[in-house]
UniProtKB/Swiss-Prot annotation:
This is GTPase Obg. The lineage of its organism: Bacteria, Pseudomonadati, Pseudomonadota, Gammaproteobacteria, Alteromonadales. Residues 1-159 form the Obg domain. InterPro entries: G_OBG, GTP-bd, GTP-bd_Obg/CgtA, GTP1-OBG_CS, GTP1_OBG_dom, GTP1_OBG_dom_sf, OBG_GTPase, P-loop_NTPase. An essential GTPase which binds GTP, GDP and possibly (p)ppGpp with moderate affinity, with high nucleotide exchange rates and a fairly low GTP hydrolysis rate. Plays a role in control of the cell cycle, stress response, ribosome biogenesis and in those bacteria that undergo differentiation, in morphogenesis control. Its main location: cytoplasm. One of its GO terms (biological process) is ribosome biogenesis. Keywords: Cytoplasm, GTP-binding, Hydrolase, Magnesium, Metal-binding, Nucleotide-binding. It is found in: Cytoplasm. Residues 160-333 form the OBG-type G domain. Belongs to the TRAFAC class OBG-HflX-like GTPase superfamily. OBG GTPase family. The gene is obg. Monomer.
């Protein structure tokens, strides 16, 4: 299935049902009083994470999603049925953003997690709600409010512990093949990798981590060049980044300048991403003699002013890859646990406090001198004033 990691959709929560103006009419009960019921609340729209999904492609063809409207209230104190909530299934790792305000509504990082993205309209109140000692035949009601309408931008961010960075043909896909069961395409031309790939690494029995491979970066990627910049967001949730550096590029480019270009693109895209722990991994060590290799590594470390750990591997021959995987596992285990995001936290919705202000405004409209004893329908059949 085609990998799609972005989609823009429109969600509309259901409108609330309106209240009813009705009066009880029975034989020998001339003044039965009000019995108009409330309307039903409109259905809300939720996103729910589903581990069985891995792409947002379905939302490219279904862009409009509308929840059910609440039913209107009826006589005999019958409350309208609430609208059914609409639940949209999305892959685990999806982020919801308000496309108009760029406000982040939340992330769905665990299977079954739900996120409210459009709140249903509040129900209208029937005239029974407005009866009092001074207003015994109220003809007031409130209408149901409109449901929330949002234009949503859905972004799928892959959940991985380790992310791979590097120029095209640096050997990232070969590395992920050497340490996991993932089988991304490998060839001797740039941009062989067109979409992100995930692999599960098992350095020890019962212990594992997830590694993500994205298309290679080139200079100017933050400004739209190449493919990698649009996939950098998939590294935002990684705990550590592996900077794969080709010690002997096939095009004769300088590894130092390539490394600097990658760091520059990271800083342009996201300072937070650039500040993540980053390990330098020198790949294709089998292409040089040992003495030349060490001189090249010393030169690279000196020019980059690198003060962190440096690992030398040959992903093709799987030399040093198993040891690196074990060190990654130990490093990830030593990191403090990530802060848990409150799954119940909700953003502010426009109708949160509407019913309070609606009740206050209706009550202010009452006149104490209103003749509530008079009713032109006292000697007629039941009449329901219902919109």
């Amino acid at each position: 299935m085609k990998f799609v990691d972005e989609a823009i959709i429109r969600v509309e929560a259901g409108n609330g049902g309106s209240g009813c103006v009705s009066f009880r009419r029975e034989k020998y009960v001339p003044d039965g009083g009000p019995d108009g019921g409330d309307g039903g609340d409109g259905g809300s729209v939720y996103l729910q994470a589903d581990e069985n999904l891995n792409t947002l492609i379905t939302f490219q063809f279904e862009r409009f999603h509308i929840a059910e409207r609440g039913k209107n209230g009826r006589g005999r104190d019958c409350t309208g049925h609430g609208g059914e909530d609409l639940i949209l299934k999305v892959p685990v790792g999806t982020r919801a953003i308000d496309n108009d305000t760029e406000e982040s509504l939340g992330d769905l990082t665990t299977h079954g997690q739900k996120l409210l993205v459009a709140k249903g309209g509040f129900h209208g109140l029937g005239n029974t709600r407005f009866k009092s000692s001074t207003n015994r035949a109220p003809r007031q009601k409130t209408l149901g409010t409109d449901g929330e309408v949002r234009s949503l931008k859905l972004e799928l961010l892959l959940l991985a512990d380790v992310g791979l960075l590097g120029m095209p043909n640096a050997g990232k896909s070969t590395f992920i093949r050497s340490v996991s069961k993932a089988k991304p395409k490998v060839a001797d031309y740039p941009f062989t990798t067109l979409v992100p790939n995930l692999g599960v690494v098992n350095p020890r029995p019962g212990q594992s981590f997830v590694i993500a491979d994205i298309p290679g970066l080139i200079e100017g990627a933050a400004d739209g060049a190449g493919l990698g910049v649009q996939f950098l967001k998939h590294l935002e949730r990684c705990r550590v980044l592996l900077h794969i550096l080709d010690v002997e590029p096939i095009d004769g480019s300088d590894p130092v300048e390539s490394a600097r270009a990658i760091v520059g693109e990271l800083e342009k895209h996201s300072p937070k991403l650039a500040g993540k722990p980053r390990w330098l991994v020198i790949n294709k060590a089998d292409l040089m003699l040992e003495e030349e290799l060490q001189e090249r590594i010393d030169h690279i470390v000196k020019e980059l002013e690198w003060d962190g750990d440096v690992y030398t591997i040959s992903a093709y021959n799987r030399e040093g890859t198993a040891e690196l995987a074990v060190k990654l596992l130990d490093f990830i285990a030593s990191l403090p646990p990530e802060e848990e995001v409150d799954a119940d936290a909700e953003v502010e919705f426009k109708w949160d406090n509407y019913h309070q202000s609606a009740n206050e405004s209706v009550n202010e409209d009452f006149d104490d001198d209103f003749d509530d004893d008079f009713d032109e329908d006292d000697y007629d059949v039941e009449i329901i004033y219902q919109r």
